[in-house]
Each structure stands twice: as C-alpha cells, then as structure tokens.
Amino acid sequence: MPTHVSKTRKLRGHVSAGHGRIGKHRKHPGGRGKAGGLQHLRSHFDKYHPGYFGKVGMRRFHLMKNPLWRPTVNLDRLWTLLPNEARDKYLGKNTEVAPVINVLQSGYGKVLGKGRLPETPVIVQTRYVSRRAEEKIKQAGGVVELIA
C-alpha cells in the first residue's frame, strides 16, 4: 500500500492526529467497565438498563417459613383431586393401572383417615399420612408414597 494515502501520513501537521486535545488517545477516558453509570454514563444506563441502580421493597430479616405447614385432606375427598375424565376412567372398572394422586400438587400436605374409599386401588403421593388413612388405602389395594 502506498504510504502517501495512509491515515498517519494524511494527519501529519495536525497536532493531535485525530485523538483530541486533552485526552490525547490515552488510557480509559470513560473509566473502566461499568464505572460512571450514575454520572457521565447515566443516559446510557437509563435508556438501556432501567432499574439497574437502587433498591426495591423491603427485606424481611427474620422471616421463617412455617415448618408446621401441612394443610390436610380427608380420604373421602381424595378422589376429587383427580380430573373428571380420570375419575370416570378408573372408578368402578377393573384396570391394571392405578391412578396416581399427588396430594402436594393440589395444595395439601397430609392425608387424614376420615371417610371411606372406593374399592379401587390408588397410588397416593403425599408428605405426611395418618396411620388410619394408610390402613384404609392399603385395604382398598392402594399404596402410599411419601415424597419430600
């Protein structure tokens, strides 16, 4: 490439060669990284990163999740946790596949033994179960699975 058209040759005689008078092509003129986000780079941060600075809401220091949380459901309401189609499919029919009722997904933590179950095997997944409820489920041919 001929030297008489290169940029450095063109800029001979112009003191700062296109790099300005004060900074003179030195160091990090805007600061390093995200420096200046609240000062000289504020318009960029406001436009492209809204909500980057500041706090929102309150922090609850001593918040304890309830260790005794266990809403209960009785055996007589157990089959209502299944959708209608599944209930019609399994109740009263002699199938080899048993329905799985996950009590935790329905918002309950413990199964209690009030009421009667139909004589259809069922797999109950729960976190806690009473002794009578477990006996009645096993009498109906079902199984209780304890899940975390």
UniProtKB/Swiss-Prot annotation:
Pfam entry (one): Ribosomal_L27A
Localization of this protein: Cytoplasm
Keywords annotated in UniProt: Cytoplasm, Ribonucleoprotein, Ribosomal protein
One MF annotation (Gene Ontology) recorded for this entry: structural constituent of ribosome
Span list, region Disordered: 1-36
Biased composition (Basic residues): 1-13, 21-31
Gene Ontology terms: biological process: cytoplasmic translation
Record keyword Ribosomal protein present: yes
A GO CC annotation given for this chain: preribosome
Record text on subunit structure and interactions: Component of the large ribosomal subunit (LSU). Mature yeast ribosomes consist of a small (40S) and a large (60S) subunit. The 40S small subunit contains 1 molecule of ribosomal RNA (18S rRNA) and at least 33 different proteins. The large 60S subunit contains 3 rRNA molecules (25S, 5.8S and 5S rRNA) and at least 46 different proteins.
Family the entry assigns: Belongs to the universal ribosomal protein uL15 family.
Further comment: There are 2 genes for uL15 in S.pombe.
Known role: Component of the ribosome, a large ribonucleoprotein complex responsible for the synthesis of proteins in the cell. The small ribosomal subunit (SSU) binds messenger RNAs (mRNAs) and translates the encoded message by selecting cognate aminoacyl-transfer RNA (tRNA) molecules. The large subunit (LSU) contains the ribosomal catalytic site termed the peptidyl transferase center (PTC), which catalyzes the formation of peptide bonds, thereby polymerizing the amino acids delivered by tRNAs into a polypeptide chain.
Protein name: Large ribosomal subunit protein uL15A
Organism per entry: Schizosaccharomyces pombe (strain 972 / ATCC 24843) (Fission yeast)
Gene assigned in the entry: rpl2802
